[in-house]
C-alpha cells in the first residue's frame, strides 16, 4: 500500500525489494 518507494513502474514491475506496482505506475510497499 503505502508509503511510496520512490520508483515508477510504467513497465509493470518494481526493482525495489518489497515494493509492488500498485497503484500503477507507482511502486508502493504492500
UniProtKB/Swiss-Prot annotation:
Protein modification: This is a cyclic peptide.
Coiled coil location: none
Protein's GO biological process: defense response
N-terminal signal peptide: none
Cystine pairings recorded for this chain: 5-19, 9-21, 14-27
Covalent link location (Cyclopeptide (Gly-Asp)): 1-30
Keyword terms, alphabetized: Disulfide bond, Knottin, Plant defense
InterPro entries linked: Cyclotide (IPR005535), Cyclotide_moebius_CS (IPR012324), Cyclotide_sf (IPR036146)
Short name of one Pfam family: Cyclotide
Annotated family: Belongs to the cyclotide family. Moebius subfamily.
Function as written in the Swiss-Prot or TrEMBL entry: Probably participates in a plant defense mechanism.
Domain notes: The presence of a 'disulfide through disulfide knot' structurally defines this protein as a knottin.
Protein name: Kalata-B14
